[in-house]
Swiss-Prot record:
Enzymatic reactions: 2 D-sedoheptulose 7-phosphate = D-glycero-alpha-D-manno-heptose 7-phosphate + D-glycero-beta-D-manno-heptose 7-phosphate
Family: Belongs to the SIS family. GmhA subfamily.
Organism: Sulfurimonas denitrificans (strain ATCC 33889 / DSM 1251)
Annotated compartments: Cytoplasm
Swiss-Prot/TrEMBL keywords: Carbohydrate metabolism, Cytoplasm, Isomerase, Metal-binding, Zinc
Binding site for Zn(2+): H60, E64, Q171, H179
EC number annotated for this UniProt entry: 5.3.1.28
InterPro entries, per the entry: GmhA/DiaA, Phosphoheptose_Isoase, SIS_dom, SIS_dom_sf, SIS_GmhA/DiaA_subfam
Pfam family of the protein (one): SIS_2
Name of this protein: Phosphoheptose isomerase
Gene: gmhA
UniProt subunit comment: Homotetramer.
Highest taxon above the source species: Bacteria
GO biological process, one term: D-glycero-D-manno-heptose 7-phosphate biosynthetic process
């Protein structure tokens, strides 16, 4: 069993090493970080969504921004579309599950906001529909995905594609990327910045 545990830890290291060496992905993480910093300086918000583990990641990232990531500072506006069960079930019942996020974006999203859709496959229909709604409202779209990026990577203004086919490794990498972005936002707006 110990050997298996070590193999899993090693696999986690390996995908992070791949990300570390992927200059294109590093540049895109920097691009999204800069977009978010500019967004917050302009009084806008990030909106996030995902399904299953990706829903948990959306909530986690939003909580780091609204609460705090590394130090005490004013709250940063961020919203996960996965938290309101009444809204999710009403929209799911009346419009279908494929529209649970797009309908919320129609009501709460504003031009200049950023929508971050999270999916390990990049093919979640409800996130794809949310991208369509976001584009109509002038909301910048970011895909945080894995595998080949799927349809979401093709549709997004910026696609952060974790180069792996393993759902657990993709999810681990998504939260790493989310944490890096939160850290940069916090330090750029309320700290001494990042080199």
């Amino acid at each position: 069993m110990k050997k298996y545990i070590k193999e899993q830890i090693k696999k986690s290291f390996e995908i992070k090493q791949t990300i570390y060496e992927n200059e294109n992905l590093i540049n895109k993480i920097e691009e999204v970080s800069k977009l978010c910093v500019a967004l917050y300086r302009g009084d806008k918000k990030t909106i996030l969504a995902g399904n299953g583990g990706s829903a948990a990641d959306a909530q986690h990232i939003a909580a780091e921004l609204v609460g705090r990531y590394g130090f005490d500072r004013p709250s940063i506006p961020s919203l996960a579309l996965t938290t309101d069960t009444s809204c999710l079930t009403a929209i799911g019942n009346d419009y279908g599950y494929d529209n649970v996020f797009s309908r919320q974006l129609e009501g709460m999203g504003q031009a200049g906001d950023i929508f971050i859709g999270i999916s390990t496959s990049g093919n979640s229909k409800n996130i794809i529909n949310a991208f369509i709604s976001a584009k109509k409202k002038g909301i910048t779209t970011v895909a945080l995905v894995g595998r080949d990026g799927g349809e979401m990577a093709k549709m997004a203004d910026v696609a952060l594609v974790v180069p792996s086919d393993s759902t657990p490794r993709i999810q681990e990498s998504h939260i790493l990327i989310g944490h890096i972005i939160c850290d940069i936002i916090e330090k750029e707006i309320f700290g001494d910045g990042v080199n």
